[in-house]
Amino acid sequence: MVSVTELLDDPAINAYILRMIGEEGIELLRRFPEGGEHSDEELAEMTGVNLNTVRHTLYTLYERRLAEYRRLKNTETGWLTYLWHLRLDRVHDVLEEQVRDALEHLDARLAYEEKNDFYMCRNCSVVYTFTDAANWNFECPNCEEMLEHFDNELIAVALRKRIDRIKESLGSA
């Protein structure tokens, strides 16, 4: 298994995790004890990272399946303790899943751009589909200026390029 340090040395993974949990979260990961399970309070004490930051980071990682917990109930007090451990071995799968989701959204956007004809109000800089423009008699509903045809070919070309690059990076081009 790859260490946290090795993962964070990868610029793409570091950027992804940084965007997800911020600098303080990265600091928690760097100081996270290897092996075993730890409560959020223990982690805050062991790492010197603020308890709220520890909790926020762990929950964010949990939402992405990059951390897991085991819940223990104190039979005397009824209090629950969550013991956490990292699952950063999944980061590549999580990243790939998110890239595939982004690809799906880009494909849908490209289909929308190719399927529709667009009209724009030069005054308001708002773009409308043909259907909406026709419903408003090709007048802007905001300022009543005439709508002009909008050529979206540059958008479609940019989307195709982006889709091709993503597919190539996923090895499915």
UniProtKB/Swiss-Prot annotation:
SUPFAM superfamilies: Winged helix' DNA-binding domain. Pfam families: TFIIE_alpha. Monomer. Interaction with RNA polymerase subunits RpoF and RpoE is necessary for Tfe stimulatory transcription activity. Able to interact with Tbp and RNA polymerase in the absence of DNA promoter. Interacts both with the preinitiation and elongation complexes. SMART domains: TFIIE. The lineage of its organism: Archaea, Methanobacteriati, Methanobacteriota, Stenosarchaea group, Methanomicrobia. Residues 9-92 form the HTH TFE/IIEalpha-type domain. The gene is tfe. Gene3D superfamilies: Winged helix-like DNA-binding domain superfamily/Winged helix DNA-binding domain. It comes from the Archaea. The keyword Glycoprotein does not apply. Signal peptide: none annotated. Keywords: DNA-binding, Transcription, Transcription regulation. Transcription factor that plays a role in the activation of archaeal genes transcribed by RNA polymerase. Facilitates transcription initiation by enhancing TATA-box recognition by TATA-box-binding protein (Tbp), and transcription factor B (Tfb) and RNA polymerase recruitment. Not absolutely required for transcription in vitro, but particularly important in cases where Tbp or Tfb function is not optimal. It dynamically alters the nucleic acid-binding properties of RNA polymerases by stabilizing the initiation complex and destabilizing elongation complexes. GO terms for biological process: regulation of DNA-templated transcription; transcription initiation at RNA polymerase II promoter. This is Transcription factor E. Belongs to the TFE family. The keyword Cell wall biogenesis/degradation does not apply. GO terms for molecular function: DNA binding. The winged helix domain is involved in binding to DNA in the preinitiation complex.
